[in-house]
């Protein structure tokens, strides 16, 4: 008699594997490895991981100005008086902020859209933080908006829409120079390439 694999795994273990597998970039094999690693780990290590996850969900939110991640009302970048208040770099996700900051090539502010235009995925203009961006451009001393959406089809479509919305507001609109891998995400670009793209950004 053949025993099914799911009958060999205790229910709590199977559930943890299932939850890990729901995370982006985690397949069934990696989910299983992570689960069995935690089974072997000291209880304090597993508890520390669980507590860190809870702390993130309970303490971290979004900046009311730029929508980057923060533990307060405003993020560290928005609170930094040394940042150039005349520039706003528009990105898709908070991870893109981290990627750009690692280059050291940009000292302005940010605005996180939390996604990109993708009608086939049911993501439209109203689902992004676009109106909030336009409100900032109208009310803050902004002179340049850098459209640093990802260099793929969705990112280009989002940049085109933003360019149209920003045109009547009289600000300079730029985009990082060519050289970033087409079809990729900013978070995977190496700091040197990304930094060069920012320094050589082109006007739209």
UniProtKB/Swiss-Prot annotation:
Gene3D superfamilies per UniProt: 3.30.60.80, 3.40.1360.10, 6.10.250.240, RecR Domain 1
Pfam families: RecR_C (PF21175), RecR_HhH (PF21176), RecR_ZnF (PF02132), Toprim_4 (PF13662)
Listed GO MF terms: DNA binding; zinc ion binding
Protein name: Recombination protein RecR
Organism domain of life: Bacteria
Family, per entry: Belongs to the RecR family.
GO biological process per UniProt: double-strand break repair; recombinational repair
Zinc finger region(s), C4-type: 63-78
Record's keyword terms, sorted: DNA damage, DNA recombination, DNA repair, Metal-binding, Zinc, Zinc-finger
InterPro entries, per database record: DNA_Rcmb_RecR, Rcmb_RecR, Rcmb_RecR_Znf, TOPRIM_dom, TOPRIM_RecR
SMART domains: TOPRIM
All copies of domain Toprim, residue ranges: 86-181
Organism, as annotated: Chloroflexus aurantiacus (strain ATCC 29366 / DSM 635 / J-10-fl)
Higher taxonomy: Bacteria, Bacillati, Chloroflexota, Chloroflexia, Chloroflexales
Record's keyword annotation contains Ion transport: no
Function: May play a role in DNA repair. It seems to be involved in an RecBC-independent recombinational process of DNA repair. It may act with RecF and RecO.
UniProt-listed SUPFAM superfamilies: Recombination protein RecR
């Amino acid at each position: 008699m053949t025993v099914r694999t799911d009958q060999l795994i205790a229910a709590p273990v199977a559930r943890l594997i299932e939850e890990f597998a729901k995370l982006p970039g985690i397949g069934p094999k990696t989910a299983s490895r992570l689960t069995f690693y935690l089974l072997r780990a000291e209880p304090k290590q597993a508890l520390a991981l669980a507590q860190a996850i809870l702390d993130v969900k309970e303490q971290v939110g979004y900046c009311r100005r730029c929508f980057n991640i923060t533990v307060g009302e405003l993020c560290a970048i928005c609170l930094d008086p040394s940042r150039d208040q005349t520039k706003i770099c528009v990105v898709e996700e908070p991870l893109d902020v981290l990627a750009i900051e690692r280059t050291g090539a940009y000292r302005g502010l940010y605005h996180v859209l939390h996604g990109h235009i993708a009608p086939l995925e049911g993501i439209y203009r109203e689902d992004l933080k676009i109106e909030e961006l336009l409100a900032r451009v109208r009310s803050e001393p902004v002179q340049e908006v850098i459209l640093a959406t990802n260099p793929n089809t969705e990112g280009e479509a989002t940049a085109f829409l933003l360019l149209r919305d920003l045109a009547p507001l009289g600000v300079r609109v730029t985009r990082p120079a060519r050289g970033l891998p087409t079809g990729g995400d900013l978070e995977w670009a190496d700091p040197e390439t990304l930094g060069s793209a920012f320094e050589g950004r082109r006007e739209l």
